[in-house]
């Protein structure tokens, strides 16, 4: 019987030690689980960010894949427009050729418009916009506000809102004040 009492007294201490050990083990496992779940969420978020970035890159590549090609076509459009400007619309000898150039230019412009290539062709008097215009010269003007477009040398173009070439323009400036002449000073 004495042996049974000894066993009974050892059992609560042993059970308590085993219980503490198990509680510690459970706590460690719960911490490891929380860390693994946190890491899993971070990896999932990183993966989602990588996917989104890749989709954006592909979208930009599709959107601006034509940029170089469109830039190479701009001098051709400029030449067709210049040819129309310099030809006399009343000359019967060149009328068929002029009509052919007009038709070709219109087809070019319609095709480029389908691919979101837009002309930047400021109207005289429009305020100068450094984002879309490049000032080639400044000229005094009594008729227009300072920093307005006086003349367009060359149209600009943008593709899907991105500038390919700025419009080359002459910008107005305020007239110089008239200095009094020697006769007026006397």
UniProtKB/Swiss-Prot annotation:
One of its GO terms (cellular component) is cytosol. It holds the Pfam family GrpE. CDD domains: GrpE. Transmembrane segments: none annotated. PROSITE patterns: GRPE (PS01071). GO terms for molecular function: adenyl-nucleotide exchange factor activity; protein homodimerization activity; protein-folding chaperone binding; unfolded protein binding. It is found in: Cytoplasm. SUPFAM superfamilies: Coiled-coil domain of nucleotide exchange factor GrpE, Head domain of nucleotide exchange factor GrpE. The keyword Transmembrane does not apply. Keywords: Chaperone, Cytoplasm, Stress response. The keyword Methyltransferase does not apply. Its main location: cytoplasm. One of its GO terms (biological process) is protein folding. Residues 1-20 are annotated as: Disordered. Homodimer. Participates actively in the response to hyperosmotic and heat shock by preventing the aggregation of stress-denatured proteins, in association with DnaK and GrpE. It is the nucleotide exchange factor for DnaK and may function as a thermosensor. Unfolded proteins bind initially to DnaJ; upon interaction with the DnaJ-bound protein, DnaK hydrolyzes its bound ATP, resulting in the formation of a stable complex. GrpE releases ADP from DnaK; ATP binding to DnaK triggers the release of the substrate protein, thus completing the reaction cycle. PANTHER family: GRPE PROTEIN, GRPE PROTEIN HOMOLOG, MITOCHONDRIAL. Belongs to the GrpE family. This is Protein GrpE. The gene is grpE.
